[in-house]
Every structure is written in structure tokens, then in C-alpha cells.
Design a protein with these regions (language model features):
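Conserved Switch II/interswitch segment of TRAFAC-class P-loop GTPases
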Residues: 222-227
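Short acidic/glycine-enriched loop/turn segments that link adjacent beta-strands
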Residues: 179-182, 228
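Structured cytosolic domains appended to multi-pass membrane proteins
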Residues: 138, 154, 185-187, 221
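Loop/turn-to-beta-strand initiation segments
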Residues: 128-130, 181-184, 212-220
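Conserved beta-strand segments of the P-loop GTPase G domain that flank and frequently precede/overlap
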Residues: 103-105, 187-188, 218-221
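Conserved D-loop-proximal element of ABC-family nucleotide-binding domains
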Residues: 194, 228-229
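Short boundary/hinge segments that flank catalytic cores
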Residues: 9, 13-132, 136-156, 161-171, ...
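Polar/charged helix-initiation
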Residues: 1-5
Length: 229
């Protein structure tokens, strides 16, 4: 009878160690990917939504606050202007002739939707198109500050409280942007206690029907979807 010490073969130990060395990192990566809930880039959006991606805006203001955040200017060729020119061209190619209204939203506040809407609107205005930016982010409006508009009491909330605002009422709540004569702004206006109820009113459809006759494009700065939800 052999009573000596029995040990596994070195080759078996190496194989087990090699297998664990591959399996454990792979398991960790799988779990990280499985439980990841954040959209982190272009590829994630393309994979999850199956929607066409018009462009990537790589650099944006955290919160569009003043005219310094307007990066598109006439007779200038900076990097951001090229980005918005590319977006403009893609949108023009995609839209049909009667499609005039474009909505801008984001997953949460501070992602740059107002920045994008404002600068794209300037880009279209520089083409000679008559453009309106409408502020429907009523809880946290930024258009008035972004374009440094003087009258804080003008805006769409003044219209939504009426069932059928007239053309004169609508025009009275529109201001020129001060950036380009082809670009007008309809700010959010005074913040009401019930913004969700206001934007659900039928009067909003009547406002759009009037504005479609006046403008080539209407850009809507909407609230983030987490606030809507």
C-alpha cells in the first residue's frame, strides 16, 4: 500500500487557472453590460432606438444661459457651425415639403436640447428661412435668458389660457431673437402652476395652425422626457 502524499497534476491546475482567468472577467463584463442602464454614446442610441442619427453634437453648453451660447454666426466657419450646418442639411433632406415643426427634447435637464434648438434655428435663419423657436419647456424655460430678451412676461402661456387666441394675440407674444432678423422667439412666458394641463389644451393646435402660415420652420424646445413622465 502506497501511503505517500497525492497531489493534482500541474497541467490540470494550469488548465483550471486558465479557465477561471477567462471566465471571471467575462462574467464581470457580462454583468456590467446586463445591468447597465445608461446610454453612453452614438452606438447605444443606434442599437436601442433603431432610429436614424442625424448628427453628433460633441460639444455643448451644460445649460444654455446667454447669447454666448449661440455658436452659429454669419460668415464664420468654426467647428460647431459645421456641425449645425450638417444637421441642417440632413433635416432638409429628410423632411417633406409640408413638414415644418421640429421638436427638441432630452432624457434629463442639462443635456443641451435648448442649445441645439437655438443654434440650429440660427443656422436655418442664415439661409433666409423664417424660423420660430417656441418655448414649451414651461417648468424650466431658458429661451428668454439665452436670447437675452427683455420682456419676461411675453410667451405661449399667455395664449394657452384662452380657448381660441387670435392671430393678433399670437403675434403679440412673439419677439425677435436679436441674433438674426429671420429668427423669432415665442418664449414660455409666465410659469403657471399647471404646465402639463396647459400644453394639453386644444388652443395649442390653433396656435400651430396660425404659425405654420407665418414661418418656414417652427422649432419646439420641449421639456425633458423624465419631467414629462
Amino acid at each position: 500500500v502506497f501511503a505517500g502524499k497525492v497531489t493534482p497534476k500541474d497541467s490540470i491546475i494550469l488548465m483550471i487557472a486558465f479557465g477561471l482567468g477567462l471566465a471571471i472577467p467575462a462574467l464581470i463584463l457580462f454583468l456590467l453590460a446586463f445591468f447597465r442602464y445608461k446610454i453612453e454614446g452614438h452606438d447605444d442610441v443606434a442599437k436601442l432606438t433603431k432610429l436614424p442619427i442625424i448628427a453628433d453634437v460633441a460639444i455643448a453648453s451644460d445649460r444654455a444661459k446667454t447669447k454666448a451660447d449661440i455658436v452659429v454666426h454669419e460668415n464664420q466657419n468654426n467647428v460647431m457651425e459645421e456641425v449645425f450646418r450638417s444637421i441642417r442639411s440632413n433635416i432638409q433632406f429628410m423632411l417633406k415639403e409640408d413638414q415644418k415643426v421640429i421638436m427638441f427634447t432630452s432624457t434629463t435637464s442639462g443635456e443641451g436640447k435648448t442649445f441645439t434648438a437655438a443654434n440650429l434655428a440660427v443656422s436655418f435663419a442664415l439661409l433666409g428661412k423664417k424660423v420660430l423657436v417656441m418655448g414649451l419647456d414651461i417648468r424650466k424655460p431658458r429661451l428668454t435668458n439665452l436670447f437675452e430678451l427683455k420682456d419676461k412676461n411675453i410667451g405661449i402661456t399667455n395664449l394657452l389660457v384662452h380657448d381660441n387666441p387670435t392671430r393678433e394675440d399670437i403675434c403679440a407674444n412673439i419677439l425677435n431673437s436679436g441674433v438674426n432678423r429671420n429668427l423669432d422667439i415665442m418664449p414660455a412666458g409666465p410659469i403657471p402652476p399647471n404646465p402639463a394641463e396647459l400644453v394639453s389644451r386644444e388652443s395649442l393646435d390653433n396656435i400651430f395652425a396660425t404659425l405654420r402660415k407665418e414661418y418656414d420652420y417652427i422649432f419646439i424646445d420641449c421639456p425633458p422626457i423624465d419631467i414629462v413622465a
